[in-house]
Amino acid sequence: LNTFIKKIKAKSMFSRPRILICCPTNITPVEKNAIKEAAERTGGRKVYIEEEPKVAAIGAGMDISKPAANMVIDIGGGTTDIAVLSLNGIVYSESIKLAGNTFDTDIIKYIKNKYKLLIGEVTAEQVKIKIGTVSTKEKEKKMEVRGRDLLTGLPKTITVTSNEIKEAIKDSAEMIVHAAKLVLEKIEPELAADIIDKGIVLTGGGALLDGLDKLIEKEIKVPTKVAESPLTCVAEGTGIILDNLI
């Protein structure tokens, strides 16, 4: 945190910048205070803490100021945050330690078990981005994958398909769907009705996984769409909030 803030100060005309830090919804008050104090010690003039799905919703262009409820699923690298928002606040939320990095791990394990081939995290991420999907494809995508043969210890190249990657990550995708269902089950019926009307918005890098929006829509029976720029929603929301702070 200290290194990051030093970089900001070096590029800014302000020696003590205002700082907004986004955190998962399941963070404790003690953890929030620790983050805030650390940021203040490193030179923050004023430090604000906001929950990431709220910031993502604002960055996605959702109007959370009205009584009508909105629902956002923010799928980051390490956590997925699911929140129902109304009147500029979070009504109910769930946070699970499963997201984009989990899909990468799933792919590594699948290829290791099926092909006895060891690949790295970077390769797994490339596979996820290029042919990753949670829907069955009639016309499969294929990709060559290079790694180390666990039987011989030598380099080896195999070809994997999009349907294989679907098989690899389906359980993790279903866990995100299950968490979203739990959120909808625990909110007031009136709020659930609002979400049926307005739909669910997906943000974060994980939102780009092919077919995930359709899977959630099919399983939950609620319209689901990916934000226009899912990768930058949190950054854009952070800027909007800071611009409106006094």
Give each language-model segment a name.
Residues 1-75, 83-201, 207-246:
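Nucleotide/phosphate-binding catalytic cleft detector across ATP-hydrolyzing
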